C-alpha cells in the first residue's frame, strides 16, 4: 500500500476502478506482487476523516491488500490528529469494512473512534 503521489496518477487509477476522481481527496493505492489492485480516496475535516471511495480494480479483489489499505488511510487520518472516521464509500463486502474497524452508528453510518486505535496493542479485534 502506497500513497498516490500525483493527481494525474490518482485520476488514472480512479478510472481503472470506475470511481470518480476527487481532486481534493488524498489517496492510497493497493498493490499485490507489484500489480495495482485497488484505490482508497479520503478526506479530513472538523467532523472527521471520511473514506469516500474504496474499490478494487475490476477482477482483482484480494482481502489482505484492501484491508491494509483501509488501515493505512485510518492511520494517516489519526496521525493528522483526527480521531473519528467514517466509511462513506459504497462497498459490498461488509465483513471487510468491519475487519478494518468500522461499525454502524445509530444512524446506520459506518463510523469508528481512532483514539488510541493504533497504540500497542492495536485494537484490531472488533466485535
Predicted ranges, named:
Residues 1-23, 121-127:
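Short amphipathic alpha-helix that is part of the acyltransferase structural core
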Amino acid at each position: 500500500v502506497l500513497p498516490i503521489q500525483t493527481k494525474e496518477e490518482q485520476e488514472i487509477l480512479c478510472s481503472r476502478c470506475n470511481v470518480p476522481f476527487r481532486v481534493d481527496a488524498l489517496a492510497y493505492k493497493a498493490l499485490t506482487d507489484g500489480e495495482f489492485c485497488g484505490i482508497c480516496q479520503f478526506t479530513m475535516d472538523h467532523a472527521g476523516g471520511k473514506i469516500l471511495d474504496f474499490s478494487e480494480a475490476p477482477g482483482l479483489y484480494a482481502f489482505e491488500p484492501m484491508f491494509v489499505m483501509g488501515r493505512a488511510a485510518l492511520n494517516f487520518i489519526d496521525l493528522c490528529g483526527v480521531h473519528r472516521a467514517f466509511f462513506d464509500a459504497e462497498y459490498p463486502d461488509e465483513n471487510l469494512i468491519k475487519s478494518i474497524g468500522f461499525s454502524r452508528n445509530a444512524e446506520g453510518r459506518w463510523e469508528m473512534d481512532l483514539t488510541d486505535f493504533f497504540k500497542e496493542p492495536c485494537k484490531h479485534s472488533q466485535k
